[in-house]
Regions:
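Conserved beta-strand positions in the central sheet of alpha/beta enzyme cores
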Residues: 20-22, 85, 133, 160
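Shared catalytic-loop signature of beta/alpha-barrel
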Residues: 80, 91-211, 215-218
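Active-site-adjacent beta-strand anchor residues
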Residues: 6, 59, 86, 161-162
Length: 238
């Protein structure tokens, strides 16, 4: 399964073989036009570093307004940004629809902080986005996520879940409408691939040259690393 990286260093992600890189937007409406200028400078810098065709995405983490998001998308068009993610809070359906109506070639994605299939139905019916991004561990688990994927398929909308490692992978491997997986680069300098769950699992699958290979083991294909598990109580017991 192909994987893209969420990272602070798209150049390292490309070197490690990932099929694209998503980086955080550093400035928002509170910083005004000076912040916008710095945002575009960063986009321009990363485009020059990784080359013309390498997929670049931007994560806005629900921090923008409708006018700001529209301006950002328009000013990013010369730099071939693949998508702009989560520009608004999750239930701002009317705002998302306005942005979608005004934006050109850049894809709009959202859904990480949407928690029910009824919310995802609203995103779809109001034409709020080009890609849905449910988090498997937040939206109701595997059963609910399957319903969301099926719902999205009726609108010809792909689903690229928010990164949750094996939980996302085993959903996505079953559906052709889930074209790529997200991997969160957790190493301090963003220069290494490390386990998303730390030492929790013995055999968590990790990307290799931009792909994750899953096994046919039962369940999610991983086992708890019991030697690393210790009980920590938030309050001391008498």
């Amino acid at each position: 399964m192909p994987v893209y990286a969420t990272t602070s260093r798209p150049d390292f992600a490309k070197d490690m073989g990932f099929h694209g890189a998503k980086f955080p937007l550093p400035f928002g409406p509170a910083q005004g036009q000076e912040g916008m200028r710095k945002n575009i400078e960063m986009v321009k810098k990363w485009r020059e570093v990784v080359g013309e065709d390498y997929p670049l995405m931007i994560d806005c983490y629900m921090s923008l307004t409708v006018p700001y998001a529209i301006e950002l998308a328009r000013r990013c068009e010369p730099y071939n940004v693949k998508w702009i993610e989560e520009t608004l809070p999750p239930d701002e359906y009317e705002g998302y629809a306005k942005i979608k109506e005004k934006v050109g070639s850049t894809l709009l994605t959202t859904g990480e902080h949407e928690y029910t299939r009824w919310g995802f139905r609203m995103l779809l019916e109001k034409n709020c986005c080009d890609v849905l991004q449910p988090d498997i561990t937040w939206c109701g688990g595997m059963t609910e996520a399957r319903r969301i994927v099926a719902l999205a398929s009726a609108f010809d909308i792909p689903v690229i879940p928010h990164g949750s490692s094996v939980y996302s992978y085993h959903l996505q491997i079953c559906f052709p409408s889930c074209p790529i997986a997200e991997f969160l680069v957790m190493s301090p300098k963003a220069d290494k691939i490390v386990s998303f769950f730390g030492n929790l699992f013995e055999d968590e699958p990790l990307p290799n040259n931009g792909y994750v290979e899953l096994t046919d083991k039962p369940g999610f294909g991983v086992e708890l690393n019991r030697e690393e598990l210790t009980l920590r109580r938030p309050y001391p017991r008498d």
